[in-house]
From Swiss-Prot:
It comes from Oleidesulfovibrio alaskensis (strain ATCC BAA-1058 / DSM 17464 / G20) (Desulfovibrio alaskensis). One of its GO terms (cellular component) is cytosol. The keyword Glycosyltransferase does not apply. GO terms for biological process: prolyl-tRNA aminoacylation. GO terms for molecular function: aminoacyl-tRNA deacylase activity; ATP binding; proline-tRNA ligase activity. Disulfide bonds: none annotated. PANTHER family: MITOCHONDRIAL RIBOSOME PROTEIN L39/PROLYL-TRNA LIGASE FAMILY MEMBER, PROLINE--TRNA LIGASE. Its EC number is 6.1.1.15. This is Proline--tRNA ligase. It catalyses: tRNA(Pro) + L-proline + ATP = L-prolyl-tRNA(Pro) + AMP + diphosphate.
Length: 574
């Protein structure tokens, strides 16, 4: 492919609304253009990267026994009403009506459609297991779309759905997809981790996220160096290693704390550390009030609380609700005498008996509170966020926190959708059984953005070879010289013969412009050809990742190039 015939509208500056590195570079490199909020046009260069990522996904899915199909993006409302998600999914679900007044939605995911398909086609245990997948456009009406392809409203996704007869079969399907994902992201040349995760709005009993490691990631991951434990902080288990404290404590005392609403203000006023306080956090779970207690220097993990309650919805109580339930403004809630039936405490609060809490009274706190003596707890549970250096729940090591970008997610759905929608089969005895499901997603367009967040520098993108739009960029620095042009054409053919897709920069531009654009678009291997180099019988090869330059001989170029290319690929761990 010649640059002069290929549409690559590079820019010197990124638009003002581009915040993260990938958004800026995707636009500057001429890979995407914004159509409207959260919706982008994939330009030829960007589409090549996305299609390369999709090709790797497709190959590994097929190798794992999944079969490709394509489902409609527009889905009828009645299927979502049948599963119970029409009302539950919220405003992220873009709802539309046709001319006959029938309700539809633009698919953010396809559990309902695939379940409807399979329940109408699969009747016997002999037809199971079954794994079907698609690579297709999705739409989620994000309230604040941002970061380009990282959090857009329209995006390209691979979603697969497995159907099994029993839990053992589901385990096998899940493991096959997990291993396929490990191969997919390894083949892409990405640094990533598979982490235990919360199932979120999809539902189900067990899941893993696949995280591309990047300092700019929105997610925090906890992992152990001494074993293979990794988890999203929403899922990460907190281990209490000390024994429960049962020390005697003095009677409860009121302390006047005027206008001291926050933990920091109360600590300063009472001259105590934050670890001496209990925070009482009030929520509405499926329409009912609930209170959660954590130590003053900890953060509540809302996902853990929601899972503990088995709630579909969990929202922080409004200031009006706080006043109604406590008789006090926000900042003075406490567990003693609290008029909320469900009251849960984090496990860590077992380790002490003498606490400072809100008094459910304006400008007042309590000291010497014993949860066992002074409150009616519903129970203890792991409710807090993991922190750096917490004990590992699997071994004697400690946990470290890092940042990541979610690019894949696998779920064990169980019977969440098949039960609700009557997706059943007949077993060997002719008895009707509910199918067990799994679902497995990869953000195909997002993985390109995540790759750039992980692999870029001050000059531009640094693509891993497997998902680079082109593997090799051949720069002709002397396009007016017929001898140079002829040699460049020969080298172009030699690189193609080596099995590489190559872009030839044949533009009538200054070398400096070509070098800047070469680094910007991130092609991993650059070959620089000019009259001076050819006079010496060499071609300059540059590894975009390291910046290292190597002189390759024109005579015997094919062999020298093959050896250098192997070196570059090894540097990527490929």
């Amino acid at each position: 492919m010649r640059w002069s015939n290929f549409y690559i509208p590079t820019l010197k500056e990124a638009p003002a609304d581009a915040e993260v590195v990938s958004h800026k570079l995707l636009i500057r490199a001429g890979m995407i253009r914004k159509l409207t909020s959260g919706i982008y046009i994939y330009l030829p260069l960007g589409l090549r990267s996305i299609e390369k990522a999709a090709s790797i996904v497709r190959q590994e899915m097929n190798s794992a026994g999944a079969q490709e199909l394509l489902m409609p993006m527009v889905q009828p409302a009645d299927l979502w009403q049948e599963s119970g998600r029409w009302d539950f999914y919220g405003k992220e679900l873009l709802r539309i009506s046709d001319r006959h007044g029938r309700d539809y939605c633009l698919g953010p995911t396809h559990e309902e459609v695939i379940t409807d398909l399979v329940r109408g086609e699969v009747r016997s245990y002999r037809q199971l297991p079954l794994n079907l997948y698609q690579i297709q456009t999705k739409f989620r009406d994000e309230i604040r779309p941002r970061f380009g392809l990282m959090r857009g409203r329209e995006f390209m996704m691979k979603d697969a759905y497995s159907f099994d007869r029993d839990a053992q079969g589901l385990d096998l399907s899940y493991r096959a997809m997990y291993e396929a994902y490990m191969k997919i992201f390894s083949r892409m040349g990405l640094k990533f981790r598979a982490v235990e995760a919360d199932s979120g709005s999809i539902g189900g009993s067990f899941s893993h996220e696949f995280m591309v490691l990047a300092e700019t990631g929105e997610d925090t991951i906890a992992f152990c160096h001494d074993c293979d434990y990794s988890a999203n902080v929403e899922r990460a288990e907190v281990v209490c290693t000390l024994d429960e404290c049962d020390a005697p404590v003095a009677g409860v005392e009121e302390v006047h704390t005027p206008d001291r609403h926050t933990v920091e203000e109360v600590c300063e006023f009472m001259n105590v550390p934050a670890a001496a306080l209990i925070k009482t956090l009030l929520y509405v779970a499926d329409g009912e009030p609930v209170a959660a207690l954590v130590r003053g220097d900890r953060e509540l993990n809302e996902a853990k609380l929601k899972n503990l309650l088995r709630a579909d919805t969990l929202e922080l109580a409004s200031p009006e609700q706080v006043r109604e339930w406590t008789g006090a403004p926000v900042g003075f809630a406490g567990p003693v005498g609290l008029g909320v039936k469900r009251l849960f405490a984090d496990n860590e609060l077992r380790l002490a008996t003498d606490w400072i809490t809100g008094a459910n009274k304006a400008d007042t706190h309590l000291r010497h509170v014993s949860l066992k003596r002074d409150t009616r707890l519903s129970g203890y549970a792991d409710l807090r966020m993991i922190t750096d250096k917490d004990p590992c729940p699997r071994c004697s090591g400690t946990l470290e926190l890092t940042r990541g970008i979610e690019v894949g997610h696998v779920f064990k759905l169980g019977t969440k959708y098949s039960e609700a929608m009557g997706c059943k089969f007949l077993d060997e005895n002719g008895k009707e059984q509910v199918m067990l499901m799994g679902c497995y997603g990869i953000g195909v367009s997002r993985v390109v953005a995540a790759c750039i967040e992980q692999n870029s520098d001050e000059n531009g993108i640094v693509f891993p070879p497997p998902i680079a739009p082109f593997e090799v960029l051949l720069l002709n620095l002397d396009g007016k010289n017929d001898d140079v042009n002829a040699r460049v054409d020969e080298l172009y053919g030699a690189v193609q013969a080596a099995g590489c897709d190559v872009l030839m920069d044949d533009r009538n531009e200054r070398p400096g412009v070509k070098f800047k654009d070469a680094d910007l678009i991130g092609v991993p291997m650059q070959l620089v050809v000019g009259g001076k180099g050819l006079a010496r019988g060499i071609v300059e090869a540059k590894d975009r990742r390291t910046g290292e330059k190597t002189e390759l001989p024109v005579d015997g170029f094919a062999q020298a190039f093959a050896a250098w290319r192997r070196q570059v690929l090894q540097g990527w761990g490929l």
